[in-house]
Amino acid sequence: MLVWYVIQVINGREDVMRERIERMVPAGAMQELFYPQFQTEIKVHGEWVDTTKPLFPGYLICDTSDPRTVQQYLLRMDDFARVLSQDGRFVPLAKEEVQLIGGFTHRGDRVVPMSEALKDGDQVVVTAGPLLGHEGLIKTINRRKSTAYLELDLCGRRVTTRVGLAVLSAEHRVMRNLKRAIA
């Protein structure tokens, strides 16, 4: 049975390290190695541009049944990379954590799509995307950066992470959809 384990790497080098680890570790030792990302929008020169950012900066997720072998290959690398462990034992992601990440993404495309929400007075109501039905995970929202901050458990630790959330008034939503239809 394959299980997801977390590999800690240097923050900002997730993609480079994923490629190096995939070259270093034999294909039979890992089913999949990825770093989950989220889709969001940033404003560049007055225009909204789609971009992706790491969901858990500094962490990769490895689908393996043999974390010890993966760790042995990581120790041979010049760069910092290690399978997370506690008291000398490798700690897999809990079933709930795997279901949450697996529910937001799918194999081959580990990017959490952007959610949409409507601002109704002081309330923000998620109307579309992976956050629909998971509103309880949202701790804060930064409308200017089109992100929602979620608090969840990862390997027994409370972690705050970001996902894309476009919060629009009803009028802005109509205008944005119209612009996308024209483009």
Describe each model-derived feature in a short phrase:
Residues 129-131, 141-146:
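Short, conserved beta-turn/loop elements at beta-strand boundaries and strand-helix junctions
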